[in-house]
């Protein structure tokens, strides 16, 4: 129940990448309460150690940032930050790592390895990992473990398999340039909206016709903006 209450706390304070000030403070507060000394990263994020000082070091990593998504769930622990939400489960990742820290601290005398807790900022914009590496956070780590919540797996179960587990992403932005005019005279215009709509439909043929069907892939157009007037 304590871990669930932590999850509710973090769910209410989602913050975007490298803006996780409140999240960082709350993580430090929880670790300090366990008797674990937190080290703040720059500009956000936290690391800490549990176990013997001069020992083989295992890193446990969780990401801590939220998404620019509005939450409308009416949950009692709904996001308090308008336009931001923990929609990718990083609140659960934080809670899981804090839970592991709590358990490991209680059995610290039995540990034969040192555990480094790594609360990584800014995973969603793909810049946080490089940031903590540049600060030397992984220099004293021999191996690292992480996880990701997955809604298709039943609560209380885990899924482990060799090789790649989840897909990597690339982002694209495309600008279609047309020629403005009036809807009553489309023959005098170059309609960029039609161009964009045609692209959205036909870009799916990359997956359907250009790639090996045995390989997993997907193309998503997440946002399309066009025009300012209805006519």
Predicted regions and their residues:
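Acidic/His- and Gly-rich active-site-bordering loop/insert found
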Residues: 1-86, 91, 95, 99-111
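Histidine/acidic-residue-rich, glycine-tolerant segments that coordinate divalent metal ions
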Residues: 67, 75-85, 92, 109-230
């Amino acid at each position: 129940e304590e871990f669930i209450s932590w999850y509710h706390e973090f769910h209410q304070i989602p913050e975007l990448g490298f803006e996780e000030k409140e999240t960082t403070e709350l993580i430090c507060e929880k670790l300090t309460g366990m008797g674990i000394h937190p080290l703040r990263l720059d500009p956000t994020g936290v690391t800490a150690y549990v176990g013997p000082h001069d020992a083989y070091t295992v890193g446990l990593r969780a990401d801590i940032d939220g998404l620019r998504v509005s939450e409308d769930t009416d949950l009692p622990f709904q996001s308090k930050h308008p336009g931001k939400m923990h929609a990718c489960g990083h609140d659960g990742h934080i809670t899981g790592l804090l839970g592991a820290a709590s358990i490991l601290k209680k059995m610290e005398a039995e540990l034969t390895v040192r555990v480094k807790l790594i609360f990584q900022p800014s995973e969603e914009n793909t810049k946080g990992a490089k940031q903590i590496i540049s600060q030397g956070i992984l220099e004293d780590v021999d191996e690292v473990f992480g996880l990701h919540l997955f809604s298709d797996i039943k609560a209380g179960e885990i899924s482990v398999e060799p090789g790649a587990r989840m897909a990597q992403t690339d982002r694209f932005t495309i600008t279609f340039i047309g020629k403005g005019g009036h809807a009553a005279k489309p023959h005098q215009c170059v309609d960029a909206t039609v161009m964009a709509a045609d692209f959205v439909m036909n870009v799916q043929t990359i997956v359907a016709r250009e790639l090996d069907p045995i390989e997993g892939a997907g193309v998503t157009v997440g946002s399309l903006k066009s025009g300012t007037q209805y006519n």
